[in-house]
């Protein structure tokens, strides 16, 4: 009888809890975006994911269309022209 209780205790301790409502988040754009049915207010849709949902990126994300690395140093001196 003690063996049965020990077996049940071990079985219940190793059981993975089921969390309802939590789903695996599908990432896109090199883990920069999240696939959603509709993007949040501060996100922009970009292309589509494998499950035909929009790939939502934060509005501040910059996307390189050419595929080359761009200079992303946006310091004040490089952003505005110098005044004489």
UniProtKB/Swiss-Prot annotation:
The places in or outside the cell where this protein is found are: Secreted
Tissue expression pattern:
Abundant expression in the male reproductive tract only. Expressed abundantly in testis, while expression in epididymis decreased gradually from caput to cauda.
Instruction: Decide whether keyword Signal is in the record.
Output: yes
Keywords for this protein: Antibiotic, Antimicrobial, Defensin, Disulfide bond, Secreted, Signal
The leader peptide range reads 1-21
Instruction: Name the GO terms of the biological process aspect.
Output: defense response to Gram-negative bacterium; defense response to Gram-positive bacterium
Give any Gene Ontology cellular component: extracellular region
| SS bond partners | 28-55, 35-49, 39-56
Q: What does this protein do?
A: Has antibacterial activity.
Q: Sorted alphabetically, which PANTHER family does this protein's record hold?
A: BETA-DEFENSIN 119 (PTHR47902:SF1)
**Record's family?**
Belongs to the beta-defensin family.
Q: What is this protein called?
A: Beta-defensin 119
Q: Which organism is it from?
A: Macaca mulatta (Rhesus macaque)
Taxonomic lineage from the root: Eukaryota, Metazoa, Chordata, Craniata, Vertebrata
Whichever gene encodes this chain, its name is: DEFB119
